[in-house]
């Protein structure tokens, strides 16, 4: 089989080939540099520098691909969730994506974002807007920023708890049900009035303010 060289790539194909090689190395847990990726893609050692200034630029390009793939996983046509149940399925898809692509997910969220990479910033913003748009449509009177932070924190936390082995991964179905059950439990708890004993206990734990002494 003939060796692939940089001369065989058409315009735009070299970048795609480098990203495929880098993604394969990332998911396999192989440390990579631009030179290592070039060897994996079977191109010249200097070829990657045509598209990526350094390893950080290559990592940002992988993160961009990850954000876009995750957004498609949540909504193929980019439409916001049309119901609360669909919003919950967004959370399920988010966690399952993390388990299917652990190294990529960690690269996307577990490392400091390169704020100087406009494409990466935009891709992350588009993912956030999918959630924000869903919340605006479903809960028009809510504090959307606070609600988005809460929902993302729960979902993101579940993703990393599974990745870190703090929660058993099990089958896809088991993980999906755990995500659904967790969100359902929170919805139920916050929609149910606190019992008298709970409120009494909270009051008992509230420290009594001591009046300030008069200076007279």
Task: Locate each region found by the language model.
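Basic, helix-initiating cap at the start of DNA-binding domains
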Residues: 1-27, 31, 56-60
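Append "Primarily bacterial transcriptional regulators
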Residues: 36-40, 48
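Generic hydrophobic, amphipathic alpha-helix propensity
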Residues: 13-22, 37, 62-66, 70, ...
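Amphipathic C-terminal alpha-helical segment
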Residues: 153-170, 185-194
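N-terminal intrinsically disordered/low-complexity leader segments
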Residues: 1-13, 194-216
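Hydrophobic alpha-helical connector segments
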Residues: 75-104, 125-128, 151
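Amphipathic alpha-helical packing segments from all-alpha helical-bundle domains
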Residues: 115-141, 145-150, 173-185
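Amphipathic alpha-helical segments used for helix-helix packing
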Residues: 99-115, 160-168
């Amino acid at each position: 089989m003939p060796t692939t060289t940089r001369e065989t790539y058409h315009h735009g194909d070299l970048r795609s080939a480098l990203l495929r090689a880098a993604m394969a190395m990332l998911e396999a847990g192989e440390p990579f540099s631009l030179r290592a990726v070039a060897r994996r893609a079977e191109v010249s050692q200097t070829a990657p520098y045509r598209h990526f200034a350094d390893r950080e630029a290559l990592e940002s390009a992988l993160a961009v691909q990850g954000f876009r793939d995750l957004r498609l996983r949540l909504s193929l046509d980019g439409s916001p969730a049309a119901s609360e149940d669909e919003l919950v399925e967004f959370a399920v898809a988010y966690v399952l994506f993390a388990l299917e692509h652990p190294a990529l997910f960690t690269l996307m969220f577990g490392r400091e974002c390169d704020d100087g990479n406009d494409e990466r910033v935009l891709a992350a913003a588009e993912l956030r807007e999918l959630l924000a748009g869903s919340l605006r449509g479903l809960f028009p009177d809510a504090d959307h920023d606070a609600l988005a932070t809460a929902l993302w924190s729960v979902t993101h936390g579940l993703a990393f708890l599974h990745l870190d082995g703090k929660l058993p991964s099990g089958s896809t179905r088991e993980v999906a049900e755990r995500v659904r059950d967790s969100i359902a439990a929170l919805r139920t708890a916050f929609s149910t009035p606190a019992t008298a004993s709970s409120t009494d206990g909270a009051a008992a734990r509230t420290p009594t303010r001591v009046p300030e002494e008069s200076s007279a």
